[in-house]
Each structure stands twice: as C-alpha cells, then as structure tokens.
C-alpha cells in the first residue's frame, strides 16, 4: 500500500507536525498549548505545521466549534502551511485502505452480535481475564460481506510495542494488552484511531505532539502503521494542565477558552508566553518573544510533570506586554474592546495615546477600555464615593476659577492646562489636590485618571468646560 499525499511532500522538509483538534467545543488552553508546542517545534526546525480537524464524531462535532478553533488559532497567530483538512471529507480514502487491509489479511470482518460480545466480556471478567475480543470471526466464511458487521484490525499477538517518547522516554506495551481494534463501524464509518493513522501517513507527519491522554492510543496506531508499511512518527505526550488547586483544569477555575482570554482583555503574546512556560523553560527566563521561543524550543526540554495554571502570573505577563509592546500594536487589540463595550471612539484621542496614558495603570485591555470611556462619551452621574470626598461646597470656587482660566487658553496642551491648575491653586492659596481632585471628578466622573494635564488634553477643551460647569451645578444643587 502507498500513501496518498494531500500536498507536495517536500523531501527537504525534515520536520512536519500537526495540530488535530476535535470540533466538539472551543479551543481550550490545553489544546492551545499543544498547538503552540507543535508549531514551535516545526518552526525551530524550519519545518511545516499542518492543521487537521478530527470531526469523525458526527453527533458532537459542530461548525460553530470548528469556527471557534480557527478563530482561536488565528488570534494566537499560529499559522499553518497546510490545511485545515477535515476527516469527514476523507472517508473514501480511509475505506479504500481498510478494504485493501481486508484483502491482505491485515484486517477482518466481525459479525458478532452485541449479546455475544457482552457474554464474552462477562465470562472473561468472571475468570479474572482481561476483556478482549476472541477472534471468533477471524477466517469467517459463513457470512456475506453484505450482512451487518464491523471491521477489526488484526493486532499482533506476540511481542511488544516499544517507542521512544520525546518527552517521557522509552515506553513499552505488550501486544497481549491490546485488542483487535474496530477500525470500521457497522454503519461503514471509519473510527478515530484508524483515521489518525492514515492522515499522519498521507500528510507525512514526522512528529506527533499531543496530550498524555493519548498514550494508550499510540501502540495501537503504531501497529497499524507497521501493518501499512508506513514510517512511524516520533511521539511526544505532554502532561495535563491543572488548576491552582491541583485538580484538572476546568470551567470552575475560570476562563479555559482561548477566546475568553481575548474577551477578558489579554494580549495573544501574553497568553503564548504563559502557555509555553507551562511545562517548558529555559533557565530562569520568564519573558519570551515568539522569536525567542522558536529559537530555543525543544521537545526534550518539556517537563513530564503536570503544570498548574496561575491566573495571577498570566495577569502579570499581560501587564508587561501592555507596557512593552508598541502602543500602535496594543491599540489595534484595544479597539476590539471598545467595540465590544459599545464605546464609539470616533470623537476622542487616538487609541495609541490611550495606551500610552493607561499602560501603567491597567493590567487588561478590557479594564483599559472601561477606564477610558470618559475620553469618548459624556456621563450622566458621578462616582458616589468621589462625590462624597471631593464635591463639597468648598470645591465650587476652585472649579469656577480653573474653568475661567481654562476658558481663556489659546492653546490646549500639557503645559498650558497644567499652568492653569497651578495658578488656580496659587491664587486661592490651596494645595494642588484641592483643585486637581474636584477637577478630576468633574471631567472623568470618578476619582481616578492619569495626570490632570494629560486627562484634559485627551478629553479636549469644549468637553472639559461643559463638564466642569455640570459639576458646579451638581454641587450647588446638592447644597441648596
């Protein structure tokens, strides 16, 4: 039998990896880390990365889940050279290989009823034997191929499957532990373990990076590959990700979908940096650009131990990237959050200026968008705590005075606005806070913002003056 290449298998490419999610849900952080490791290994070796959608579970696979996976991969910027390929579109190919295997005696039809199989299992369990098929139908000539049947792979009965896992080292499993795997169901559809084998063969996959939950599938898949005369890829099984409580990561630990992190205001660079460190490291280094990851990543450096997810560490990394990446780049991601929060940014400062103003204060872009709403939209109310603290009757005079000085300004910049506040404080013999804090609440609606000169320039002159007058009227109305 021969492989049927889906694309040009360049002989110069020595490493070809794949990410093969099942579209039964969103792209979760465990899957994203597997994709990242697979992608990095291919890039490190100037190889190719293939995306394959394993949608053989027809009942649970959905187009929405496929779209969510593709969206997550695109957001993380994990680009693929080939794909996405869908297993459901390759059933003819799988069945062609199965038919050839039957002809060559590598597989056989099994006509056993559910009742017979249940009786067999019960008998084996009573005799304290490992449940396995007894090859009752091997060499069966009594039944017609038209009768309902499954197809089983004729697994070797002697010897062992031995493979060198790139992460875990030598793994050996006795063939006596393995059953004659069903490779085609009664309805004619090929099974997961078989489709994976044919795909890896046809796609020339050299390295399979996947979760440790697949270790039990590997010896079965290796035996099928050997039967086909196909090359055996190198396997690397990475450990699971745990929550900070030591339990398997799940929804109760917070966001587990990649796109949920986007929605919560994280940058893809932060999530990638965090995920690569969940099981891999290079000395004590914490911050890795994608270029550094590609240069340094090796599967042999991946830990065998499970890693615990720490949201605080991810938040720290996110704040680092908000501060350190170019403001123009961060602003492109920030724009999505304004749109998501229904904030019209057409009338206000440039988004990259918002990033420069708030990068030190805000740890997420979601927080940054919410904290800068007042630059683009007027507000109907003031923060209650800020009103109680700063909107006393004594605030009316400095607000009126600073409004007068700001109104008279010919140029609206950092120097002139700061001077107006400073002069107001000096003339009224007040500390800067007695002028600046009521002014801050007046123009932002809250007691927190960047420095007042930066804030005023961002809001603009016309809006600033209207808001100060609104605050003066509000204080007077509260103290009638």
UniProtKB/Swiss-Prot annotation:
Q: Where is this motif: 'KMSKS' region?
A: 248-252
Q: Name one GO biological process term.
A: glutamyl-tRNA aminoacylation
Source species, domain of life: Bacteria
Extent of Basic and acidic residues compositional bias: 122-146
Q: What is its EC number?
A: 6.1.1.17
Q: Which portions of the sequence form the region Disordered?
A: 122-149
Q: Which reaction does it catalyse?
A: tRNA(Glu) + L-glutamate + ATP = L-glutamyl-tRNA(Glu) + AMP + diphosphate
Where's it found, cell-wise?
Answer: Cytoplasm
Identify the residue span(s) of motif 'HIGH' region. 21-31
- Listed binding positions for ATP are 251
Keyword Aminoacyl-tRNA synthetase on entry: yes
Q: Which GO terms describe its cellular component?
A: cytosol
Q: What is its main location?
A: cytoplasm
Q: Which HAMAP family does the protein's record reference?
A: Glu_tRNA_synth_type1
User: Its function?
Assistant: Catalyzes the attachment of glutamate to tRNA(Glu) in a two-step reaction: glutamate is first activated by ATP to form Glu-AMP and then transferred to the acceptor end of tRNA(Glu).
Q: What is this protein called?
A: Glutamate--tRNA ligase
Q: Which organism is it from?
A: Pasteurella multocida (strain Pm70)
